[in-house]
């Protein structure tokens, strides 16, 4: 792992400006998906560790939607974020020199994939996509990989049109993963999608992901919902660092994050949205397919 980590750091050094200025603060962007208070609480330990490691004030930013973090990274107002694969693709396609992927969250078996999970209320009688005919389907955010991009490709490929009124009565955005879960529970939509590693027990919300976080938080009792669809494996999104950061800052943050699980497993649990084996090196190459899918999706919508 140390050799791979060194290679990642060396690669990021090649794309960084030669004369980066010293930083006076460090800013970590948190993607939407759950309420801002819970996002801040889950990442406060990491913020404190970062502030100690860098010796400068460190702030967490909770954007209202995915695009807020995407634009913050592109515009240089954010220094670090854990992105979904589609959100990383959005950053890369707008400015390929803005950030570099350095690490990825791994599952307990060492893999770094997860799934888009379709679900409905257990008392709805819906047990599969077939049962969603003439029903309302909720999706989290147009920049979410599991909350929109992958379902947009895989659900039509399985024979179910995503055009509102053709199979589903309507296809709507809820604003985020947690919002989708709440919308299904409240009956605002008949079914929805969110993300999970797909490992472990359903009644726990799997081992990690939004179902696990929402179950831990008491937002959902997993006995009240059922799985109605599951995507093929999706590459877990990368932790990225802004390329314009000084090299010593990028090195410190990569090493801090890579060692977080060993140093403080409970903190890593909160940051990783559940059980994790830790954070391992990753490069841009892991996301080439997702970038191609996003380009194709944008071409179709234009």
Regions found by a protein language model. Name each.
Residues 15-20:
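Sec/Tat signal peptide C-region and signal peptidase I cleavage site
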Residues 21-89:
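Extracytoplasmic small-molecule ligand-binding "clamshell" domains
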Residues 32, 62-66, 77-95, 104-105, ...:
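Beta->alpha turn/N-cap motifs
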Residues 104-160, 164:
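A conserved helix-loop-strand patch within extracytoplasmic ligand-binding domains
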Residues 138, 142-246:
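Pocket-lining segment of extracytoplasmic ligand-binding domains
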């Amino acid at each position: 792992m140390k050799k791979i980590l060194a290679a990642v750091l060396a690669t990021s050094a090649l794309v960084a400006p030669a004369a980066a200025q010293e930083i006076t603060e460090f800013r970590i962007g948190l993607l939407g998906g759950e309420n801002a208070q819970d996002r801040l609480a889950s990442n406060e330990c990491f913020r404190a560790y970062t502030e100690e490691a860098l010796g400068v004030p460190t702030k967490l930013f909770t954007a209202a939607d995915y695009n807020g973090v995407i634009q913050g990274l592109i515009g240089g107002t954010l220094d670090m974020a854990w992105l979904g694969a589609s959100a990383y693709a959005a950053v890369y396609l707008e400015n390929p020199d803005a950030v570099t992927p350095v690490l990825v969250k791994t599952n307990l078996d060492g893999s770094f994939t997860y799934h888009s999970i379709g679900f409905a209320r257990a008392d709805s009688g819906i047990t599969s996509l077939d049962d969603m005919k003439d029903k309302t389907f909720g999706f989290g955010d147009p920049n979410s990989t599991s909350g929109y991009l992958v379902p947009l490709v895989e659900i039509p490929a399985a024979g179910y049109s995503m055009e509102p009124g053709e199979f589903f009565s309507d296809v709507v955005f809820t604003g985020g993963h947690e919002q989708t879960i709440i919308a299904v529970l409240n009956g605002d939509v008949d079914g929805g999608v969110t993300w999970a590693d797909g490992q472990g027990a359903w009644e726990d919300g799997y081992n990690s992901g939004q179902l696990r976080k929402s179950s831990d938080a008491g937002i959902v009792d997993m006995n009240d919902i059922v799985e109605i669809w599951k995507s093929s494996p999706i590459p877990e999104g990368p932790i990225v660092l802004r390329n314009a950061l000084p090299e010593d800052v990028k090195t410190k943050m990569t090493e801090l994050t890579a060692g977080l699980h060993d140093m403080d497993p409970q903190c890593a649990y909160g940051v990783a949205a559940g059980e994790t084996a830790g954070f391992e090196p990753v490069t841009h190459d892991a996301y080439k397919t997702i970038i191609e899918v996003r380009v194709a999706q944008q071409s179709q919508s234009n």
